[in-house]
């Protein structure tokens, strides 16, 4: 698991460095990273990890805590159906509904934040 965490951290740092260098200024998706980038980032990270010999599953969930029926989606990866790999969870850092989740890289078992989301795809 330590190797996965190191690879995920390296991948996240590369995105952060590109963002700081202005590489995403004209990009409609990544210019606001990590906000609204979880699906695309999970896809890219999955390929990166696969290239390193680590097979992952894409997971998408929706938080349906609002009474108006609208929800908030979030995506991450899983290894062996039990280890979460999430490098965009900090997009929720200023939202108390989502526990002010501020982890830019999370690799581990299910936690309170990820349990908020009803999983749709696995």
Task: Give the ranges of each region predicted by the language model.
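A structural boundary/capping signal
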Residues: 1-122
């Amino acid at each position: 698991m330590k190797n996965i965490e190191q690879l995920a951290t390296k991948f996240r740092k590369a995105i952060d460095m590109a963002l700081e260098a202005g590489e995403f200024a004209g990009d409609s998706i990544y210019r606001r990273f990590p906000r609204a980038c979880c699906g695309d980032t999970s896809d890219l990270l999955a390929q990166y990890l696969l290239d390193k010999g680590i097979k992952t599953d894409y997971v998408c969930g929706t938080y349906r805590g609002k009474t108006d029926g609208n929800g908030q989606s979030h995506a991450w990866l899983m290894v062996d159906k039990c280890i979460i790999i999430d490098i965009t969870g900090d997009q929720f850092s200023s939202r108390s509904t989502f526990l002010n989740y501020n982890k830019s890289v999370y690799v581990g078992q299910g936690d309170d934040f990820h349990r908020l989301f009803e999983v749709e795809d696995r």
